[in-house]
A protein has these predicted regions:
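Aromatic-lined, polymer-binding surfaces characteristic
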Residues: 98-99, 106-116, 123-323
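Catalytic and substrate-binding regions of extracellular carbohydrate-active enzymes
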Residues: 373-392, 396-558, 562
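Short alpha-helical segments and helix-capping/turn motifs at coil-helix boundaries
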Residues: 88-93, 147-152, 613
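Short linear interaction motifs
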Residues: 80-90, 363-366, 406-411, 519
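Carbohydrate-active enzyme catalytic cores, enriched for enzymes
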Residues: 137, 141-148, 298-304, 311-449
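Extended repeat-based interaction scaffolds and adjacent low-complexity, acidic/S/T/P-biased segments
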Residues: 464, 478-672
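Low-complexity, Ser/Thr/Pro/Gly-enriched N-terminal "stalk/linker" regions
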Residues: 24-100, 128-133
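Bacterial Sec-dependent N-terminal signal peptides
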Residues: 1-28
Length: 672
């Protein structure tokens, strides 16, 4: 399958290579850099002020930015490129980039047109514009023309975008489809079905075939029924449990903004074609209730985790679509609190937009979090969140009063709450003291075989991911955060990425790891989440002496002030940094050669400079490291009690076990 995907990307980058490299228009005007809720509703949404109308306003705000590139009805949705690694490149991929811009901004437009068919932005009637652009796809004389898939054609990015287009045709059928002539409908059906009926990839991509086929089957066209049913069976076979699908091979947000969005929407819209599959999609959706919402922090904000993170708040759409469920015990007020908070997390961040368009990054532009399959218009996949507007105004998702779910009363201070999911080996940990959530997840991909360079990267290879501390990229000088780095035979600092899950018992999350370039360098890893951080109990074995490093999370700068180092009078061995909003502490319970406070530049997603605590040690053959990695919210200093949750550490003479006695007299043993 990887060879197939590689071929697709090469085709994307080469597509349109005979064209003159397209010029990108400049915006007609600048929109507000952040979104302001026009009419906050604190009665139903006391925490965010965002109700259903507020969601409509936010969608219009984002779509208005895209429409500043549209001066007349012929102008494509084609936006300024960011980062050389993305496409289009040198005359290539322009047609596909325009198609992405068209189909993905339509995820904003279609729900809005469903509400208001006469919507006008930048002096352009939105419905007229998208219908015109839809017909341009069928016109051989148009620069946006998409050829029907040839007899021997394979899956491509066009299939992805046509799958999205099929959903939008369903969403705003009265505006986008019904006004077309029969001849136009037939041409569109022929082109889209040439892809939908055709070959696919055994991942979330199969949904694109399903939606194209389903829409045109509903409209009475002859379709490849075998292809649709085959895709549905294979999609359901990727379900692992507890709300998670495996997207061949990773667990990430694709389980949510793809599988747990497409499945329920298909079930509600076209499930009558195969009722048994529809029922299974809905059952799988219900499973996420007890796990996925716990990934968001106390304020309902999302974690920076996995690939395609520029899709950002698209991650909340499955929480909204729980409105399709009939279970009265679902806390819809909490679901909307999360969805609205995550939406505002970005649209109210002044770094989100550049030239009126969302950046390729987490908040602002951040190349390490961007993949080579993206173009600038790819960011509008975030607009999937607005499919929440498919739910009518009287749906409980919209009418329930916002609340913080378990963060209000169930979660207690000075406690830690683990949600281990045995079907996937994912561990979600909630920390009431700091109000944050942490994820430990899958990564086992070599750089050598990771030709797209993302499944082996920082997007997946960290020891953990925390909502309060977005991940720092690895530095050229061996700076590393929330991971170990080992100096390999080439003298390079190589981070861990080949993890094998072992167990989760007695609050201890166990993994083994080996170094890609030397499988004889082995780590036995144990994470013990605590109320104010994590206790690491790790063993490393090396065939020849070498150096290792361990980095904590990082702190961004705040208010233009640098991250500062602090000292504790009561616990002088603690190394502490603070940015005024949070503090981090590293307390070494076994010896390291060196602990440094560093200020890396250009590798943090929030600010140019950040603060990092990093340990370093020379390993002769085998050693055990026991390390407290702590955090605290606010500007108050760590107390002695917070810095000393461990009373004693006893390492067996053979280094095969470590016994930890905590300050509260509980005892845990890690066996290697």
């Amino acid at each position: 399958m990887k060879k197939t995907i590689k071929g697709i990307l090469i085709a994307v980058l080469a597509l349109g290579s005979t064209m003159t490299f397209a010029q990108v228009a400049t915006p007609t005007h600048k929109i507000d850099q952040t979104f302001t809720i026009p009419a906050p509703n604190y009665k139903v949404s006391p925490l965010t002020g965002l109700d259903r109308q507020g969601w409509i306003d936010a969608a219009e705000y984002l779509l208005e930015g895209a429409f500043t590139y549209v001066r007349n009805i012929d102008d494509p949705m084609y936006f300024p490129k960011q980062f050389e690694k993305t496409y289009p490149r040198d005359k290539g991929g322009v047609i596909t980039a325009k198609l992405e811009g068209f189909c993905r901004t339509l995820f904003l437009a279609a729900p809005l047109l469903r509400e208001n068919p006469d919507l006008t932005l930048n002096g352009i009637k939105v419905g007229d514009y998208y219908r015109h652009q839809l017909l341009n796809l069928l016109d051989p004389k148009s620069p946006s023309y998409v050829k029907p898939l040839g007899k021997n054609g394979g899956p491509s990015q066009t299939l992805v975008e046509f799958g999205a287009l099929a959903i939008s045709l369903t969403t705003a059928k009265n505006v986008l489809w019904d006004p077309l002539t029969q001849e136009q409908k037939d041409k569109l059906a022929a082109t889209m079905l040439s892809y939908g009926n055709g070959p696919t990839i055994g991942s979330n991509w199969m949904f694109f075939n399903v939606f194209v086929i389903s829409f045109f089957k509903q409209e009475g066209y002859k379709v490849n029924d075998w292809r649709m049913e085959d895709c549905l069976k294979k999609l359901l076979a990727l379900y692992r449990g507890e709300g998670w699908y495996n997207d061949a091979p990773a667990y990430d947000y694709y389980s949510m903004w793809a599988f747990q969005m497409y499945g329920p929407i298909w079930a509600q819209t076209y499930g009558h074609f195969y009722p048994e599959y529809a029922a299974q999609f809905m059952k799988n959706q219900a499973d996420l209730i007890d796990n996925y919402p716990y990934m968001f922090n106390a304020e309902g904000k999302m974690n920076m985790w996995g690939r395609s993170i520029p899709y950002r708040f698209g991650a909340v759409v499955p929480l909204a679509l729980l409105g399709y469920q009939t279970d009265k015990d679902i806390n819809y007020g909490w679901m909307r609190r999360i969805a609205s908070s995550t939406l505002l997390q970005f649209v109210q961040n002044p770094n989100l937009l550049e030239d009126n368009v969302p950046t390729l990054g987490f908040y602002g532009p951040f190349e390490p979090a961007v993949q080579i399959y993206s173009c600038r218009g790819s960011v509008y996949w975030c607009a999937k969140a607005f499919l929440a507007l498919l739910l009518p105004a009287d749906n409980p998702f919209w009418t329930a009063k916002e609340n913080n779910g378990p963060w209000d009363k169930e979660f207690k201070k000075n406690k830690v709450y683990n949600k281990f999911q045995p079907a996937t080996n994912l561990l979600i940990t909630d920390y009431p003291n700091v109000g944050g959530s942490e994820m430990r997840s899958w990564c086992h991909e070599t750089v050598a075989k990771d030709w797209q360079k993302f499944r082996s990267s920082e997007n997946y290879n960290k020891l953990a991911y925390h909502t309060e501390f977005p991940w720092m990229a690895d530095g050229k000088n061996g700076e590393v955060s929330m991971n170990y780095a080992t100096k390999n035979a080439k003298g390079q600092w190589e981070v861990l990425r080949l993890y094998t899950f072992k167990s989760f018992e007695d609050g201890i999350y166990r993994r083994d790891a080996v170094l890609e370039t030397n499988l004889d360098i082995k780590y036995n890893l144990a994470d013990i989440p605590l109320p104010n951080g994590v206790l690491r109990v790790d063993k490393v074995s090396v065939p020849t002496p070498t150096d290792i490093r361990l980095g904590h999370y990082t702190l961004s700068e705040t208010f233009g002030k640098p991250v500062v180092e602090r000292k504790s009078k009561n616990v002088p061995e603690a190394t502490i940094i603070s940015n005024g909003e949070y503090s981090l502490a590293m307390v070494n319970l076994t010896d390291w050669d060196k602990t440094e406070v560093l200020h890396p530049e250009g590798i943090h997603p929030v600010t140019y400079k950040c603060g990092l605590i990093q340990n370093e040690k020379h390993i002769q053959s085998e050693d055990v490291m026991v390390t407290l990695m702590l955090w605290k919210k606010g500007n108050k200093e760590f107390s002695k009690k917070e810095l000393t949750p461990v009373k004693s550490v006893k390492i067996a003479d053979d280094k095969k076990s470590v016994t930890i006695t905590f300050a509260d007299k509980t005892v845990k043993t890690v066996n290697f």
